[in-house]
């Protein structure tokens, strides 16, 4: 989860968190088929493992898609050291909708693939790279579809901006070594782009699984409970409560 700024937390709490507050749908409808196509497009490059040709080609594609929807795109490049001393040429992609708005929301996901399928039930595949359709591509696909629908609706308020951040070098870590994971996100947190701050953020991770259900995550409830409740309530009111059970997980 992402920790809220205190002002945002207080304002959210003042607005109330119960289900009696209506949440009106805004903007054009999210298209699941479009998001699926964006997932498939990323996978068509092959596993997007660090320093690979597939990784480089997918980076260019993601940037071009965000730009095609009129978003302002910047990259944050860094050479980051992996667990075995390998240097990862990492690129965080930052795509801004309505970049001049002072009130901003951060939406993020990682876009790289894990180089080893070490959790595959078939042990013969443990040294093969992961295609990462769900764990990586699905989150980026949701962000691309959100960028598409936001850019398509000219009636939306210009007072709110959204920054979509695709984190790199996420998934080459080792179990038991927390610092070896999320290298791109760690770099982003330590080198926050100048002039950007957010009222709150949402991290999308493994959101494309068949029959997926999303429970309220513990760290998010600890640091941003009012926002979590608003998101889950909005899902229920929009008819998607079966995907967002009203329970912690």
Question: How would you describe each model-predicted region?
Answer:
Residues 127-226:
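Acidic/histidine-rich catalytic neighborhood of metal-dependent amide-processing enzymes
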Residues 48-50, 79-82, 100-101, 111-115, ...:
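Solvent-exposed loop/turn segments at secondary-structure junctions
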Residues 77, 87, 200, 207-249:
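Active-site-adjacent substrate-binding region
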Residues 4-27:
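Ser/Thr/Pro/Gly-rich low-complexity linker/stalk segments immediately outside membranes or between
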Residues 34-41, 57, 61-68, 73, ...:
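Extracytoplasmic/secreted proteins, especially bacterial periplasmic and envelope-associated proteins
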Residues 37-100:
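A non-catalytic alpha/beta surface segment that caps or lines the substrate-entry region
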Residues 18-23, 36-48, 126, 211-214:
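Acidic/histidine-rich, surface-exposed loop or edge segments in extracytoplasmic proteins
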Residues 39, 43-50, 66-70, 97, ...:
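Sec/Tat-exported extracytoplasmic proteins
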